[in-house]
Amino acid sequence: APLWDIVPLLAALYRDRTISTELREDHELISGLATENYRLAVLTEPVRGHGLVSRKYGEEHLMFSLPAGHPLAGRKSLRFSDLNGAAIPLRPGIGFWEEIPRKKMPDSHFFVQERSSSFEELVHAYAMPCFSSDLARRGRELEPDRVTIPIDDPEASVEYFLAWRRQDEDFLRPFLDAVLREAPRGK
């Protein structure tokens, strides 16, 4: 979700550069920064040392999106265990958010829908529960036939940190000035 804001800003500020993204584990991104494969990374933990700098960028909170008629739809909050055993479609390219429910809901059946349109059709046609987040919902109208309910488990919340090599700070200054004056995002 942080890339939804970051990539367009980078593209606008660095028009003469190619902007590319990869979804990787934090340790792989840190290694890529250290070996100069990356100039900027979004991590879920702050990093210090090895010539790297990080600053909090924002946070994200996972939620269940349920059909309005679902037995749990009236609850103020839920835990992963409340829907353990359910069949739940997942959007593609959600990175670590795919692994957390798999670990916390071992009896559930998860299946990734490769196209967003297929995901939406499936969720609505079969009135299935799915995941959303405060960042995914930002700027979007709530669907009248669904409710979103926060997940209380600590694993359902994450902080994001921008990380970069200190030697790239001058190059990244326009981006850092623009994005960090507005941070943190989420909640």
What are the residue ranges of the model-derived segments?
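Secondary-structure junction motif
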Residues: 2-6, 80, 84-108, 172-176
